[in-house]
Amino acid sequence: VNWLPVCADAHGFVVNRGLFEQYGIPLPTDYESFVSACQAFEEVGIRGFTADYTYDYTCMETLQGLSAAELTTTAGRKWRTAYSDPANTARVGLDDTVWPGAFERMAQFIQDTHLTADDLAHTYDDVTGMFRNGEAAMYFGSSAGVKVFQDEGIDTTFLPFFSQNGEKWIMTTPYFQ
């Protein structure tokens, strides 16, 4: 099962569409254009992308969002099922099938978004403050953030994770194995 009809909070990229229009930068449609947008914003002194990495769940969701294609393969599903099964008493570590590629993609994402050690201290309030003040064009967040900023008069939209293989993924809470 890849999809179930339930209510969920979608997690992906909250985007200040107004900044994109103001600087003539196209909205990303794939990973390459996401990286190009980040670079274009940095050239004008605006952070292209950031996230509240002080929280471990943000790091995990980013890793999962970038690797959704692998995590939905047979090997990925087998690993996730064993890892998350509360009845499983065997220790389940990271395998050598799914995870090497996942960490390679995360390393590339860190480079492409120019993540630094200072970013690891960003809280939700820090990140949304940067976004609200036009200091960041995109941040990792939930679909609820779009409405919050739209209510404040900021032209905001929501984009998925762009996989380097061309696929697009949105993380949801709750999630299903």
Segments the model singles out, each with a brief description of its role:
Residues Y31-S36, A117-R132:
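Short helix-initiation/N-cap motifs at beta->coil->alpha
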Residues Q22-L27, A107-H122, E135, E152-D155:
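A local structural motif
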Residues Q22-Y23, D112, Q150-Q177:
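Extracytoplasmic/periplasmic substrate-recognition and gating elements
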Residues C38-A40, T81-D119:
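Glycine-centered hinge/linker elements that transmit conformational signals in sensory
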Residues D52, Y124, G141-V146, P174:
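Beta->alpha turn/N-cap motifs
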Residues V1-L27, Y53-P86, M171-Q177:
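Periplasmic solute-binding protein
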Residues V1-W3, F13-V14, V35-T50, C59-E61, ...:
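Pocket-flanking alpha-helical
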Residues A137-S142, T157:
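Paired acidic/hydrophobic, glycine-rich loop segments that form the ligand-binding mouth/hinge
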